[in-house]
Amino acid sequence: MTIALGKFTKDENDLFDIMDDWLRRDRFVFVGWSGLLVFPCAYFALGGWFTGTTFVTSWYTHGWASSYLEGCNFLTAAVSTPANSLAHSLLLLWGPEAQGDFTRWCQLGGFWTFVALHGAFGLIGFMLRQFELARSVQLRPYNAIAFSAPIAVFVSVFLIYPLGQSGWFFAPSFGVAAIFRFILFFQGFHNWTLNPFHMMGVAGVLGAALLCAIHGATVENTLFEDGDGANTFRAFNPTQAEETYSMVTANRFWSQIFGVAFSNKRWLHFFMLFVPVTGLWMSALGVVGLALNLRAYDFVSQEIRAAEDPEFETFYTKNILLNEGIRAWMAAQDQPHENLIFPEEVLPRGNAL
């Protein structure tokens, strides 16, 4: 039996092909299909943040100033979260809360959901951009995989955590001092520094910084020279095709320092990828746990003994008292609508403060 294979011809004017050709053609700044997501989302997220920090107050949601117009500076300005009473509303401009009134939308905290959602999709689009470009030039997708770590942290902190709580109100506001305040909140209400997932995150970030410094210094130490002159390092020539540093020399150096060293570049660079990415992912998982109000380590026996014996204190019991102080102060400040009044006997006391 003979089977005839005919070549399938597509319409040369097919809209998808025209779009694909224009989006993926070689240009100074690659656009790609991912660009349809990342460019508008990044534009709106950054534009919303600059607009919010410049003009929009937090008086109606938090009871304080947060814009340059009110006297804040770069460190104290922020796009603040919506009020606690708005729960998890998307706060669309045309929604039932603002009803198309832009001024009211700003007063209710609409810029926060605007920046958070466009920012999240912008970051996801940037990861897809790396994946798309890597596929176009036949690279492995490890850049996109690595960038998934900061995306996981952003989504867990700004979206998943407040979704697990009573509203967007408990997410961080977009500002420098606002993030610091959120860190204090995490410590006071969740004892975050004693959480093992936070410990893994710190180990990953600081470990990656150490690996980066060691790696950069080692490569600089073992650069090849092409002569006796002080300024003839061929390694700084971008057109040099061959190796620019000696892995063998680096291996011998660290073998003498530590007794062990990386035997090849692939394992070395995979380790430099693995440490920060794993640390950030573990930290993101920990924040998801906090969204569900899961506890960190609780050394109850030390707390009981400290309560019974005034002379017994540990760094842990001192930190627990500090956390109580944070909660007592922040709850009343953050939720003025609750009219929280704490009697003297519930405020932190003892020799820790």
From Swiss-Prot:
Record-linked SUPFAM superfamilies: Bacterial photosystem II reaction centre, L and M subunits
Residues holding chlorophyll a PD2: 198
Annotated CDD domains: Photosystem-II_D2 (cd09288)
A GO biological process held by the record: photosynthetic electron transport in photosystem II
Any one GO CC term of the record: chloroplast thylakoid membrane
Chain sites annotated for binding pheophytin a: 130, 143
Modified residues (N-acetylthreonine): 2
Membrane topology: Multi-pass membrane protein
Modified sites of kind Phosphothreonine: 2
Superkingdom, natural source: Eukaryota
Record field: transmembrane: 41-61, 125-141, 153-166, 208-228, 279-295
Binding residue positions for Fe cation: 215, 269
Cofactor detail note: The D1/D2 heterodimer binds P680, chlorophylls that are the primary electron donor of PSII, and subsequent electron acceptors. It shares a non-heme iron and each subunit binds pheophytin, quinone, additional chlorophylls, carotenoids and lipids. There is also a Cl(-1) ion associated with D1 and D2, which is required for oxygen evolution. The PSII complex binds additional chlorophylls, carotenoids and specific lipids.
Catalytic activity, as annotated: 2 a plastoquinone + 4 hnu + 2 H2O = 2 a plastoquinol + O2
Binding positions (chlorophyll a ChlzD2): 118
GO molecular function, one term: electron transporter, transferring electrons within the cyclic electron transport pathway of photosynthesis activity
NCBIfam families: psbD
Subunit details: PSII is composed of 1 copy each of membrane proteins PsbA, PsbB, PsbC, PsbD, PsbE, PsbF, PsbH, PsbI, PsbJ, PsbK, PsbL, PsbM, PsbT, PsbX, PsbY, PsbZ, Psb30/Ycf12, at least 3 peripheral proteins of the oxygen-evolving complex and a large number of cofactors. It forms dimeric complexes.
Other known facts: 2 of the reaction center chlorophylls (ChlD1 and ChlD2) are entirely coordinated by water.
Entry function: Photosystem II (PSII) is a light-driven water:plastoquinone oxidoreductase that uses light energy to abstract electrons from H(2)O, generating O(2) and a proton gradient subsequently used for ATP formation. It consists of a core antenna complex that captures photons, and an electron transfer chain that converts photonic excitation into a charge separation. The D1/D2 (PsbA/PsbD) reaction center heterodimer binds P680, the primary electron donor of PSII as well as several subsequent electron acceptors. D2 is needed for assembly of a stable PSII complex.
Protein name: Photosystem II D2 protein
Species the sequence originates in: Populus deltoides (Eastern poplar)
Lineage, highest ranks first: Eukaryota, Viridiplantae, Streptophyta, Embryophyta, Tracheophyta
Gene designation per UniProt: psbD
